[in-house]
């Protein structure tokens, strides 16, 4: 029996970015985001994260996206880098913002793509499932020329083949021990 491929579509909308002054830097906000890129010394950029779940045994074949032509925006200052994490102790520590030369001297965009994803396996409601975690980056930053590009709409398409049968795991397992033949007599 041939399993038909299915497609899920997720459409997201973001507003035009707002530029906020922050000392010698700026930061960007956009309605429609729910998180930020949080890598120390790298630009603090808006992002949207969501996780979808599929029954165990589902094969995710492709995750693609479509966007309109990105809009360009010139920034008055560099985007603020995230500070280094501070230790959890009772001493005073000043937060340091050290722009990563690896990123801030680049002519290519950061983070580099409008979407990334990971496929993992875990439990949801105590049942094994496939998790598809999506990260959408509606703002791309060109640090060397202090310019940004942003999108307001993205359509994500997930192509997958559903599980061919229910892969529920039994509650009781037999014990399987894999060992060299040298030890097999001791295990019996």
Regions found by a protein language model. Name each.
Residues 1-188:
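Extracellular pro-sequences of secreted precursors
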């Amino acid at each position: 029996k041939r399993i038909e491929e299915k497609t899920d579509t997720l459409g997201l909308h973001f507003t035009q970015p707002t530029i906020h002054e922050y000392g010698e830097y700026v930061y960007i906000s956009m309605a429609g985001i729910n998180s930020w890129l949080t890598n120390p010394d790298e630009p603090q950029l808006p992002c949207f994260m969501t996780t979808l779940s599929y029954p165990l045994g589902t094969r995710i074949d492709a995750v693609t996206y479509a966007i309109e032509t990105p809009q360009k925006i010139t920034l008055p200052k560099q985007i603020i880098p995230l500070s280094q994490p501070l230790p959890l102790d009772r001493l005073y520590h000043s937060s340091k913002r050290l722009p990563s030369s690896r990123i801030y001297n680049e002519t290519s965009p950061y983070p580099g793509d409008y979407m990334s994803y990971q496929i993992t396996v875990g439990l949801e409601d105590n049942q094994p499932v496939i998790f598809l975690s999506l990260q959408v980056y509606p703002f791309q930053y060109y640090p060397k020329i202090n310019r940004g590009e942003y999108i307001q709409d993205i359509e994500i398409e997930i192509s997958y083949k559903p599980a061919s049968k229910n892969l529920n795991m039994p509650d009781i397992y037999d014990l399987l021990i894999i060992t060299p033949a040298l030890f097999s007599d001791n295990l019996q």
